[in-house]
Design a protein with these regions (language model features):
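A conserved beta-strand-to-alpha-helix junction within the catalytic ATP-binding
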Residues: 86-101, 132
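Short acidic helix/loop segment immediately C-terminal to the autophosphorylated histidine
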Residues: 41-49
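Conserved catalytic submotifs in the C-terminal HATPase_c
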Residues: 86-91, 110-122, 158
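Helix-loop junction within the histidine kinase core
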Residues: 72, 76-87
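Glycine-rich ATP-binding loops of the HATPase_c
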Residues: 198-205
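Detector for a conserved hydrophobic position within an alpha-helical segment of the HATPase_c
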Residues: 190-194
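Primarily the dimerization/phosphotransfer
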Residues: 2-42
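Short alpha-helical segment of the dimerization/phosphotransfer core of two-component systems
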Residues: 60-65
């Protein structure tokens, strides 16, 4: 709980600093997009290799810029309880298997994700897209990385409290090596999302156990 409180406080501080300096944070990728776009359109002496390199820079910075803005908007909507959800019936074991596949695919095979589940079949009513986005963020690297990594997702059911309990071990998202403003905001988004659906979200301080993330969602 102490770690979760720290995450919440850090995320609030980060968001405040981010909003106060949004023009600076946006300016860097925006300037790269504009600058390299101008080079592509005006410098007739560029060879094919340089054109490809500049195009990749433009694409990467455009993606970063969009993600940066979307995360802050999502966080603001969740905190104001104005987030719109698309609720549907979902089978959780099927969704988890899909997430394991997506983690391997999106990391080009560098994330060796594995699912351990005591739950054979469980239907939930939730926003599957939001759920997938949150869980996938905990399975893959928050920034491009080609290091092989074992990540395990465990799924169990708390019958008494009518909760599904998830535990992700060795998540790159809480690895101190990848700490950043965007990671702190993503963690806060995940916390608010699971709390909205009647669950909880907690990050352990134990480095020895791979900083496990435990979160839950109500089965009602």
């Amino acid at each position: 709980m102490a770690r979760l409180s720290e995450i919440a406080e850090e995320a609030n501080e980060v968001k405040s600093r981010f909003l106060a300096n949004m023009s600076y944070n946006i300016r860097i990728p925006l300037n790269n997009v504009v600058g390299f776009s101008q080079l592509l359109s005006t410098d007739m002496g560029l060879d094919d290799k340089e054109k490809l390199e500049y195009s990749e820079i433009i694409q990467a910075n455009s993606t970063d810029l969009i993600q940066l803005v979307n995360d802050v908007l999502d966080l603001s909507r969740l905190e104001a309880k104005m987030m719109k959800f698309q609720i549907q019936d979902c089978e959780i074991r099927e969704i988890c298997n899909d997430l394991i596949y997506m983690a391997r695919r999106d990391s080009n095979g560098h994330i060796h994700a594995e699912l351990e589940s005591d739950v054979e079949h469980q239907m939930l009513r939730m926003d599957a897209n939001r759920f997938n986005q949150a869980v996938l963020s905990m399975l893959i690297y928050p920034v491009p990385n080609d290091t092989d990594r074992e990540v395990k997702m465990q799924l169990s059911k708390d019958e008494e409290n009518q909760l599904l309990i998830f535990r992700i071990i060795n998540s790159p998202l809480v690895d101190p090596a990848f700490a950043s403003q965007q990671v702190s905001i993503r963690l806060k988004i995940n916390q608010l999302l699971f709390e909205h659906f009647g669950g909880s979200f907690m990050v352990s301080e134990s480095a020895e156990d791979g900083y496990p993330i435990t979160f839950s969602i109500a089965t009602l």
